[in-house]
Amino acid sequence: MQDERRHYQGRVSELAIVYLGLGSNLGEREENLCQALTLLSRKVSLEEVSSVYETEPVGYKEQPLFLNLVCRVTTRLRPEELLHLAKEIEARMGRIPSFPNAPRPIDIDILFYDNKIVKTQNLIIPHPRLQERAFVLIPLAEIAPDLVHPEMEKSIAELANDVKGQSGVRKLTGGFDVSAICGRAL
C-alpha cells in the first residue's frame, strides 16, 4: 500500500528540495548549461551542481554528443510552476518542440521534487525514465548517492551502479565551477 502522504497535494508552504537534470547538445554546450543555471537561479535557490558529463545521445543517435549535469535546488514553486519555468527557459534559449530525443540547445527535466510522487497529464515525478538513464543517474549519484527513489525504494547509488550505458558517460576533467564558467557566482 502506498504512503499517500508522499503524493503531492498542490500546496507548498516550505522549501522543497528538487533535483533537476540539464542537458545540451547544440551550440555552445557549456555556455548553454551556464545560461540555464543563471536563469534558473533567478527563481530558485541553486544549492549544488554536479560535474559535467559528456554523453552519447539516447534514442536518436544521429546527433552531437550531449553535455549533462544535475543540480539540487530549493524552491517554493509548486511542481507545475517549476515545469512552466523550465519550459519557459528552454523556449527562451531556442528549443523548438520537435520529435522525442531530438537535438536541443537545452533540456531541463524535473527528476525529483522532495520525496513526492506527482502524476498529472503534463508532469510525472519522479522522472519516468530516470532509472534507465546513465546520463542522469551518474551525475545525480555524485551529489545525492543516498537519495532514495520513492517508488523503486532504491538509492540513486544503487540505480547508477545497475544502469546500462555507463560507458557512454564521460566525466569532464576539472568539474563544473559555476563561478569560473559563468564568470560570477550564482
Protein language model annotation of sequence segments:
Residues 4-43, 50-56:
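N-terminal beta1-alpha1 ligand-phosphate binding loop
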Residues 5-10, 50, 57-65, 83-84, ...:
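Flexible, gly/pro- and Lys/Arg-enriched active-site loops
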Residues 23, 72-76, 113:
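Solvent-exposed residues in well-ordered beta-strands and their adjoining turns
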Residues 35-79:
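Short, surface-exposed acidic-centric catalytic microdomains
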